[in-house]
Amino acid sequence: MCIRDRDADLLGAEAAYCALEDELQRYLDTYTRTHDYDEYHFDLDTIEHDPYVLLSIVCALHEGEWTLDEVRGTLQMLFDRQYILTEDVVVEVRYRTVTRTDSEGNDYDVEVPYNYYICYVTLENFNLSHVPVYMMSEEQLSMYALYMSTLGNRPDLFPSSGYIGKYITNRPPEHEVPESYLDDETFAAILKEAEKYLGFPYVWGGSSPSTSFDCSGFVSYVYNQCGWSFGRLGAQGLYNICSRTSSPRPGDLVFFVGTYDTAGISHVGIYVGDGWMLHCGDPISYANLNSSYWQSHLYAYGRLP
C-alpha cells in the first residue's frame, strides 16, 4: 500500500472495514429473528471487497500519509457508498375465517380482515472498485491508479488478494503481432499507441493515461489519438457506431456480452489478428480470443467508420 505508512495502520484500516462488513452480515443473518414480519424476501449481493482497492482509495484521498484514526470517517463513507441496503414493507389486507356462536348457540363463520406484513430486503454491493470515478478528482484518480498498478509496493501485505495473481504471480500472456500486419499504417499507429499502456490497471470510468482506463475508455482514447474524433464512448456506444463484420482484420473492434451484470455490450477490445485482442482487462494486456471464457462471451466484430 502506501509504503510510507505503518503496517499497523494499513492492516488496521482493512480490519476496521471488515468489521463494518461483519456487522452488516450479522444484521442480515439474524434478520428474521430480530424482526416481526409475516413473510420475508431477500435479494442480497455478496459482502466482499479487495483490500488493495480499499487502501488504494484511502491513500489517494489522503495523499499517501494517514493514520487509522484519521481515516475512520473515510472508511465509513466508502462503506456507505459500496453497500446499499433497502428494506421495504408491504402491508396486505387479508382475511381469515373465524367461527363464532350466535345467541341461540349456533356456530357460524365470518371473514375477519387482518394486516399481513411482507418485508423485502435488498442489498446491493456497488463494487468498491467502481466508487473512485464518482468521488475523486482527476489527480486523485491518477494516484489511485498508481497505487493499484504497484499494489502500493506491498504485494506481501494481502497475499490472498485476487490482484496478486493478476499483477504478480500469474501475469497475462505476452503476444507479438506479426511484422507484416504493420504494413497497414493505420493499424501500426493504433498498435503503437495501445501498447504504450500495457500493464496499466483497470480503473472503472478511467479514460486517459493519467487516470488509467476502463475497457471502453481505453479503446476510445487510443482511436481518438489515431485519427478518429468520436470522443469518449462506452462499449455499447462504440458498437453502435461500428459496422459489423464477419471477417475481422487487425484494427477492428471485438465486442462481448455478459462479462458482468449489465444490459447490452459489456466489454470491448482491439482485434490484432490471429485470434488475439489487446484490451483493458485488469491490467491492460493481450488476450487469446480462443479461450473458453472469451468464446462464451463473444458477441461480434465491428469496424469503425
Regions found by a protein language model. Give the residues of each.
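Extracytoplasmic/periplasmic/luminal assembly and interaction segments
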Residues: 18-74
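Stable alpha-helical elements in mature extracytoplasmic
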Residues: 20, 186-190, 194, 214-215, ...
